[in-house]
Amino acid sequence: MSTGDSFETRFEKMDNLLRDPKSEVNSDCLLDGLDALVYDLDFPALRKNKNIDNFLSRYKDTINKIRDLRMKAEDYEVVKVIGRGAFGEVQLVRHKSTRKVYAMKLLSKFEMIKRSDSAFFWEERDIMAFANSPWVVQLFYAFQDDRYLYMVMEYMPGGDLVNLMSNYDVPEKWARFYTAEVVLALDAIHSMGFIHRDVKPDNMLLDKSGHLKLADFGTCMKMNKEGMVRCDTAVGTPDYISPEVLKSQGGDGYYGRECDWWSVGVFLYEMLVGDTPFYADSLVGTYSKIMNHKNSLTFPDDNDISKEAKNLICAFLTDREVRLGRNGVEEIKRHLFFKNDQWAWETLRDTVAPVVPDLSSDIDTSNFDDLEEDKGEEETFPIPKAFVGNQLPFVGFTYYSNRRYLSSANPNDNRTSSNADKSLQESLQKTIYKLEEQLHNEMQLKDEMEQKCRTSNIKLDKIMKELDEEGNQRRNLESTVSQIEKEKMLLQHRINEYQRKAEQENEKRRNVENEVSTLKDQLEDLKKVSQNSQLANEKLSQLQKQLEEANDLLRTESDTAVRLRKSHTEMSKSISQLESLNRELQERNRILENSKSQTDKDYYQLQAILEAERRDRGHDSEMIGDLQARITSLQEEVKHLKHNLEKVEGERKEAQDMLNHSEKEKNNLEIDLNYKLKSLQQRLEQEVNEHKVTKARLTDKHQSIEEAKSVAMCEMEKKLKEEREAREKAENRVVQIEKQCSMLDVDLKQSQQKLEHLTGNKERMEDEVKNLTLQLEQESNKRLLLQNELKTQAFEADNLKGLEKQMKQEINTLLEAKRLLEFELAQLTKQYRGNEGQMRELQDQLEAEQYFSTLYKTQVKELKEEIEEKNRENLKKIQELQNEKETLATQLDLAETKAESEQLARGLLEEQYFELTQESKKAASRNRQEITDKDHTVSRLEEANSMLTKDIEILRRENEELTEKMKKAEEEYKLEKEEEISNLKAAFEKNINTERTLKTQAVNKLAEIMNRKDFKIDRKKANTQDLRKKEKENRKLQLELNQEREKFNQMVVKHQKELNDMQAQLVEECAHRNELQMQLASKESDIEQLRAKLLDLSDSTSVASFPSADETDGNLPESRIEGWLSVPNRGNIKRYGWKKQYVVVSSKKILFYNDEQDKEQSNPSMVLDIDKLFHVRPVTQGDVYRAETEEIPKIFQILYANEGECRKDVEMEPVQQAEKTNFQNHKGHEFIPTLYHFPANCDACAKPLWHVFKPPPALECRRCHVKCHRDHLDKKEDLICPCKVSYDVTSARDMLLLACSQDEQKKWVTHLVKKIPKNPPSGFVRASPRTLSTRSTANQSFRKVVKNTSGKTS
């Protein structure tokens, strides 16, 4: 600032700096500085300094006052927490005074200072505060306290786009709309000079109209003049991060706004496909796919994505040098994907959104997920012993969008005291202010009068409503009267019904007496039955004696003793059951006697109840008479009420006439007042104009000011007098209207009193009616209770009858059981002898089954080898056929060349030509014969294939016959094949030799004829007729040749079709063979289990000798484990979760079943060879960062060879080629560079290997998944152990499995680790690093595991 400037200009500039919200020394910033100083100094250790203590004692009270006056968190009511992040949370709040709804974001100061390298709160505040864009969430207020920063933003009730994509399948039309809005929003941020760096659906919010706005600018960074950014940390979400941002980790990152357009491409792909393009379950997998995006970006075949959409996605997901949007937004807007007829780029915000949220209130949070309460303790700043300045980084954060203090004032007001003209102007202004105040008062009086008129109108409306209510009440009374008459008729009807019911009850009582007499007779019968049961007991005792004798006889027998003892025990049990039945019969007799006594008591009670009912009936008749008398009196009162209502109606009509008259007068008054107001307004306008004229004259002439002033004052006084008179007249009229209103109020009160009297009478009548109805209901309830009791007694009598029938049936069944027992005793001896023979037969069957199982295994192996040999032979035959076709084609080409050479010498070599044509016909006939022979061979092959398929089906039933037939068929087939091959070879050799000799002869003859001297003379003598004949013959020969060629081509097509059919049959046979192999594997595991059971039986009973330990795998119980495990469903945990499968681990296989029913049917979905296992290990959070934290301790990983897998054809796709990635070899490890944003520790030094925002450079072995710091390799530290896993990564696969608990996971891992073979599988020894092509992901995604093709089982 120049020293020549006056103090006033300096003060003006300072004032502007204090008022400017973007200034670093505005008033809020200065207040924040004072507040921060007080917070940072107000500690006991610091107050020992006198200067600090004096400062606090001077400013602490004033700062506390300012804190109370400024905005604070207590000004808002918290409705709900709608979001939570690394630095704090987002709350839905309502302002207590204005009742407006906002979204308030809380940021912890402690967390932001702790992670200062990744906290960009200043950028977030500035973008939301000063963006002034409809595509950015607006910031209204920003304030702070000692623990938090608060940002009060507009509430977006539509939720984020993640919620929308989870609720809807997004069509391409919607995707076009939302992508266009994201493009415009990012353009707004880029135009402010910022890069977002974390564009994802979570940060795209929808307002109440469904339009999109960007939020969460905590990762934004300011661009330099060249539009670039320098950063050495990889900021963003793994799925949406660009390759250039990934490369910036640990190095000198230098990139521009094109990194945001990459995220837009990922977002568009996710909307259309439903998943991100570089999805993987581990961070290593996602990062390696992003770096290898040229090969890993693919589109699914089942999604109908347009070419324009694919083109746009590919244009976004490319290298930054060629990426769309690098040269500006206009090239994105011009893309064909955004062409449509529904909206334009300029009117996009005004169009209707595809999804408009349905909101119930201004605090509707249905589009946000419910969050659990954060129960963790919040960290705060520790009490310092010296000055730290924890509050200083946040000075100036406070922001108010509508600042009112330090409002603009005219700075030139202080200069007016110097000149006399300015003093006159001030005096005039004062007078003008006074006049304006008077006008303002008059306007207030006018408003008061209008309010009084409105109140009178409101009162009149109330009176009209009350009159309407009186009419409704009168109608209700009439309806109640009609209801009372209806109830009277109902009461008479009920009385008649009660009389009928009383007669019915008398009849029922007679029936009950009859039933009681029948029950007595039934009891006597039951007593007789009990006597018969005693006879049955005597018979039972005789049977017991017989049993004892039979037992003595059975004891004498040596081998039959065991079975007869069992039968004896069974008989004793049956006898005990019979005894228990007798006891039950006795107890039932007692129950019947008790029930008889109870029925007698009930009978006496019923008699007493009947007498009481007779008395009540007489009382009811008296009550009915009283009710009839009351009804007549009520009818008279109703007539009286009708007469009173008619009077009220007349009074209401009079009041309505009075109201109409008052309304007319009110309207007239309103017209007069409006006319006067208009005239006053016109006069005011004239005065304002005159005032302006006087102001203009004041500047020219100072002398005429006083005269104009006096004239203006006189005119204003006259006008004020006129206005006062008009006001008095208006007040008089208002007084008259108020008098009329008071009269109407008096009439209203009278009518209300009458109404109250009528309503009181009505309520009394209603109470009496209610009492009568209650009495009637009580009587009806009593009657109903009596009826129910009678019904229960009748039901009990029916039950007694049923019990009698049951007792009789049981006695009959006991007698039959005795007879059966006697019959069974006789048959037991016969059964024992038969059982001995069956035992011997079973032993023979066991030995035969063991022998059969060994034969079955050997036969299955032989059949497998034979099938493989036959498949190879078929392939060889196909190749031989193709070779033969090629030789035939060459022979035809040679014949064509011969024909052309012969056409040159057609006149000279007629004889030779005819001979050659004959030879060509012979060759054609020979070719036909050969083709027919080949057809026969193909048919034989087909027959052999059909025989093979039949043999495979008959394998299970007739193993011995099949092997003999297969051997005979093979021998015959080999002999025929050898003979055919030898014959074909000899024939072809002969043909070739003859054709060669003929060719040499023809050439020699041609040479001789050409060298003859007589050739020219004979040539001239040749006739034209001979030439024509030869031409005709040549044409015929050409036609025949063409026909032969067509026939040959047809034969080739036919054979090609047959070959294709054969190949299709081979594919079907392979699939069928695959299923058979899987079923065989499951059967083998079942056989192992059965053998183990047989071994247990042999140990306990020693029935027969079993096979040797080599055949049965002596440790079968230990080698087998089974249970429920979960596999990734469709290869995507994030969208589809886990799929449960029943897993069985036998000694050789791992079997996966969809359910237990498939296990019983031996129908596995996948089989793995244990011999092909490489590695089994528990996973870490970095391997499966998409899984929930609770599931990670339960997950483990299996690595196996491609050939060790055999699965159904449900989810198969070709094996993807290994992705080329740079890796480092060290001690057998193949390390891939990666970063960990989730908890992980170094396996070498046990130090943390992760960080949320700035993780250290790390390495992970893609074989054994060992993790370590990159520094260990760079510094050549000998801390890393050699790799324990040796296999070729290109030929290996992995699978993730989820156990039910952590203990189950440990059990599965320990069991499978024991199963891993010590030597690697053949063909999978570690390859050299030079020739090895690696994949980019150490931990393959779930999708690849599910979709890989089924490998061959060993």
UniProtKB/Swiss-Prot annotation:
The record marks D1113, G1114 as: Cleavage. GO terms for cellular component: bleb; centriole; cytoplasm; cytoplasmic stress granule; cytoskeleton; cytosol; extracellular region; Golgi membrane. The modification Phosphoserine is found at S1105, S1108, S1328. A zinc finger (Phorbol-ester/DAG-type) spans 1228-1281. Residues 368-727 are annotated as: Interaction with FHOD1. It is found in: Cytoplasm; Cytoplasm, Cytoskeleton, Microtubule organizing center, Centrosome, Centriole; Golgi apparatus membrane; Cell projection, Bleb. One of its GO terms (biological process) is neuron projection development. Residues 341-409 form the AGC-kinase C-terminal domain. Autophosphorylated on serine and threonine residues. It is a peripheral membrane protein. Residues 998-1010 are annotated as: RHOA binding. This is Rho-associated protein kinase 1. The gene is ROCK1.
